[in-house]
Amino acid sequence: MKDHQKIILVGDGAVGSSYAFACVNLSIGQEFGIIDIDKDRTIGDAMDLSHAVPFSTPKKIYSANYSDCHDADLVVVTAGTAQKPGETRLDLVNRNIKIMKGIVDEVMASGFDGIFLIASNPVDILTYATWKFSGLPKERVIGSGTSLDTARFRMSIADYLKVDARNVHGYILGEHGDTQFPAWSHTTVGGLPITEWINEDEQGAMDTIFVSVRDAAYEIINKKGATFYGVAAALARITKAILNNENAILPLSVYLDGHYGMNDIYIGAPAVVNRQGVRHIVEMNLNDKEKEQMKNSADTLKKVLDDAMKQID
């Protein structure tokens, strides 16, 4: 990739605009183009965001067209219909997979040869679809996966134990949705297994923590209509890792090819990411219960994915 860091955002709704604002505040990227079906909104947002630039570092922000994707390092997609109260993320697939195909076709027609970062839900399925539609190498098509779920997980444990969330290490794996699960066998706090921090009679509290993490989006949607700050921050973190060639380990929706006993699926797992995309997938030694949970999550996604792709074929 060139030294000049160029990001194109497709989808200027609540998630997209929050992500753009995060990138400005965190000094991520040097050029930031915004695409949306509502052109006036992108013009207004570009103006508004540019007024925040003097408080950060220099950055060119503008209302973009798909032709501007041709030399982008990263295209971030947050477009799609939103999850409504009572809907699961998987319920969105029929509406959003067609939208995604239209977006990917337009981006690829520009000559784009960078990295796709997908946040639209259901993210695991739409990331797989983007890989298929684009023809890009699997390493350069990435989904936000369980990055937000993992952040919620670490924060909830930290609140319970009254420690800094940055000292909690553990991952939510699987679908970014109802079949996700915590890898308790690899969760540590300050270098010690989580079991060293809790008594046997506190296991119920840990189970409650996970349920609150899994269902957090539903609660937020019921109260304010949508979630956007958390996922925007997660996208900004992933963007920073890619553009700055960090080789950071982040829980993302990545393509499994034999990893965890899975094939031909995008699903949430820790991966090393840099400016080439996914460099390596971290295959954790899960216990038997976690292996079964991973299989269940993958099976659920596969069924929905197969049905969704038939609509396009």
From Swiss-Prot:
The active site is at H176. Its main location: cytoplasm. It is found in: Cytoplasm. Beta-D-fructose 1,6-bisphosphate binds at R154, H169. The keyword Oxidoreductase applies. Keywords: Allosteric enzyme, Cytoplasm, NAD, Oxidoreductase, Phosphoprotein. Pfam families: Ldh_1_C, Ldh_1_N. It catalyses: (S)-lactate + NAD(+) = pyruvate + NADH + H(+). The modification Phosphotyrosine is found at Y218. NAD(+) binds at V15, D36, R41, Y66, A119, S120, N121, S144. Pathway: Fermentation; pyruvate fermentation to lactate; (S)-lactate from pyruvate: step 1/1. Substrate binds at Q83, R89, N121, P122, V123, D124, D149, T150, A151, R152, T227. Homotetramer. Catalyzes the conversion of lactate to pyruvate. This is L-lactate dehydrogenase 1. It comes from Listeria innocua serovar 6a (strain ATCC BAA-680 / CLIP 11262). The gene is ldh1.
